[in-house]
């Protein structure tokens, strides 16, 4: 594995950010190329834990000649957000300079390759240079995984409708509860920007073997060695199934098949009628019935 430290210049003299990129060389040029990043929202750590355990597994496969496809890994995809703290709280989701969500407004390349100019230009915000560079690193890879997490939640993925159910193998390998499917995007999240370029490159819309997704690895506090290893093993199993890593001869565990695949328009954000202290009656992932009480809000205790 080769490790490179790239520099993202800041907006003011003396300020710069380091982007650490790991590259593993595949033995088979025709095998799928893979790009995986985590902590684009810099305060979301489950993906970093998964990467911690995945990297040695891929290094071992590379050393033994079992890594077929080349893999690029960026465990800390947002050094700008990683450095943002306010009164001790980590502010990793939004840029305090531009007030933009770090996973929105990824640049659109034109015929002249303006996105590549952004990556080196001093005339744009460091945040835009970072976003341009991340898109460059993922460019040309048919498998692109962006590891995130929710505030609280179960394991699930976002997937383009055009790649479903072909991407069900990823949901199964990661033991996901659900897959949320989208058919159009307007916020230019990383996943959307990458998929747009996949579509532009695909002859006659042929996306066989492609996978681009945002993976939500449960909640922000779901970070420990057990979960990190489990997620790494799931990612490794997925890469084996896609022909990136040579499959093991030993029997593989049966994969989950009962996850729910639904269009994202079926997801609704519920606005509380009043502020107060919320008491949940169900846990994330539990099935509920119509009319069931899922939470109550304490407005005035006692």
Predicted region positions:
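Structured catalytic-domain cores with a bias toward divalent-metal coordination
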Residues: 1-302
């Amino acid at each position: 594995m080769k490790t490179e430290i790239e520099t993202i210049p800041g907006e003011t003299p003396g300020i710069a950010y380091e982007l650490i990129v790991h590259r593993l060389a595949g033995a088979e040029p025709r095998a799928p190329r893979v790009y995986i990043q985590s902590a684009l929202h810099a305060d979301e750590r489950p993906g970093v834990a998964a990467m911690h355990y995945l990297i040695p597994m891929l290094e071992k496969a590379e050393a033994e000649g079992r890594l077929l496809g080349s893999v690029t890994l960026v465990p800390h995809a947002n050094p700008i957000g990683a450095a943002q703290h306010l009164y001790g709280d980590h502010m990793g989701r939004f840029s305090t300079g531009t007030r933009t969500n770090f996973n929105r407004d990824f640049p659109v390349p034109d015929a002249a390759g303006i996105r590549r100019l952004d990556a080196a230009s001093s005339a744009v915000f460091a945040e835009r240079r970072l976003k341009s560079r991340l898109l460059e690193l993922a460019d040309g890879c048919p498998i692109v995984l962006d590891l995130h997490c929710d505030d609280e939640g179960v394991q699930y993925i976002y997937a383009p409708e055009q790649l479903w159910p072909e991407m069900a193998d990823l949901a199964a390998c990661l033991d996901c509860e659900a897959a949320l499917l989208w058919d159009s995007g307007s916020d230019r999240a990383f996943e959307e920007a990458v998929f747009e370029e996949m579509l532009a490159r695909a002859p006659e819309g042929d996306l066989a073997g492609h996978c681009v997704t945002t993976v939500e690895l449960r909640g922000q506090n779901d970070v420990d060695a057990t979960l990190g290893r489990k997620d790494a093993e799931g990612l490794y199993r997925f890469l084996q199934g896609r022909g990136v890593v040579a499959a093991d001869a030993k029997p593989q565990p049966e994969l989950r098949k009962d996850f729910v695949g639904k269009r994202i328009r079926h997801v609704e954000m519920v606005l509380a009628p009043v502020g107060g202290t919320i008491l949940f009656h169900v846990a994330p992932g539990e099935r509920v019935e119509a009319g069931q009480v899922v939470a109550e809000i304490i407005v005035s205790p006692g």
